[in-house]
Amino acid sequence: MYEKYPSPIKCDPSMVAMSIKENEPVSFSYEVSFVESDIKWPSRWDAYLKMEGAKVHWFSILNSLMVITFLAGIVFVIFLRTVKRDLTRYEELDKEAQAQMNEELSGWKLVVADVFRAPSNPALLCVMVGDGMQILGMAIVTILFAALGFMSPASRGTLITGMLFFYMILGIAAGYVAVRMWRTIFVGDHKGWVSVSWKVACFFPGIGFLILTTLNFLLWGSHSTGAIPFSLFVILILLWFCISVPLTLVGGYFGAKAPHIEYPVRTNQIPREIPPQKYPSWLLVLGAGTLPFGTLFIELFFIMSSLWMGRVYYVFGFLLIVLILLVVVCAEVSLVLTYMHLCVEDWKWWWKSFFASGSVAIYIFLYSVNYLIFDLKSLSGPVSATLYLGYSLFMVIAIMLATGAVGFLSSFWFVHYLFSSVKLD
């Protein structure tokens, strides 16, 4: 199996010591014995990729399941006890009784004529939702392939290459979701879909390019070998312009041709005044991010250790399960928060539903700062700390877009379902 070295160097056994002179080569030799192993080729990495502490990962999953069960119970109560009961009572009334009841309505039923009023900065919301779905799809598909063993550490760079490939391909989904959401908000108007598609193609990549360029200038200024070569920047720009942008425009075209989602109720021209709240609504939105963070903070430690401490991370099966649980928790959290806002007659739910789940990014960034202070003591100098914070910022922006898109779309479905069950003239 193994061939012997053709011309080994023989040492003179009579030479006990060797006099080493300056600027002269030093000759030495060694022996290597190759022993054929009975380990199969597909299993050659098992000894290095065996991850200890599986109980910790299972504890993380169990913790996430407890959070999901708690939120699912709240959603169950909302649907079966509150919503179904109110809808049943409402539909059993005749028209005269309904007219009288409309004057005595309270809670979410009062905002029926305002709940689908267009939000502020609708184009930005559509762009962020489209980019979020693209990032989420890329993460799920990449982790799935890694869990199935298609991306092995034996081939360096396969994980990053796979992420870039799936991200560019899923530009179709980003353009489709953003443009169709845009047409839904503007009641079927397809004008401006090209502009929305371009913004989707440029928003998140532009943020990433700005952060990476700034950090790369720091590396160039410190004469670091870790700086990204200029040629690689050119390649990334060409991939973005020649593949990602056209695919996003194609997705936007299909989104413009697809039928928009029709609102079940009409919107009044004059917006309804929102009653004063006891507590700021955004305070509740920011606090909602603690629940999604609780589902992934244990797994986050292993990921950060792999990125910054050089430890091997190959439990992609656990990571895939945690990612799915995170999506479920984000959907449930945003749905519950949206219902709570509607119950206090706050019809401005669009952005709040996005950030109810997207606020998990704030806690991840705070965790990153904590990890920098207490765990990454080997980092020296402000340049290293700036690089770490810059990459962490890029990561949390991606997480905010992905989780926010999940929360918004689940809330949109819930609100549409809720008010489509109410029959109003």
Regions found by a protein language model. Give the residues of each.
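Extracellular (lumenal) ectodomains and large extracellular loops of multi-pass membrane proteins
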Residues: 1-59
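Extracellular secretory-pathway ectodomains of glycoproteins
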Residues: 266, 270-278, 289, 298
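Transmembrane alpha-helices of multi-pass eukaryotic membrane proteins
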Residues: 55-69, 122-134, 154-171, 189-208, ...
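Hydrophobic alpha-helical transmembrane segments corresponding to the first two to three helices
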Residues: 46-220, 253
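Hydrophobic alpha-helical transmembrane segments
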Residues: 2-15, 103-113, 142-146, 179, ...
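Membrane-embedded alpha-helices of multi-pass membrane proteins, especially ion channels
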Residues: 68-82, 134-150, 170-183, 207-222, ...
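TerminUS-proximal long segments
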Residues: 14, 18-19, 371-425
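Interhelical loop segments of eukaryotic multi-pass membrane proteins
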Residues: 81-109, 142, 149-162, 186-199, ...
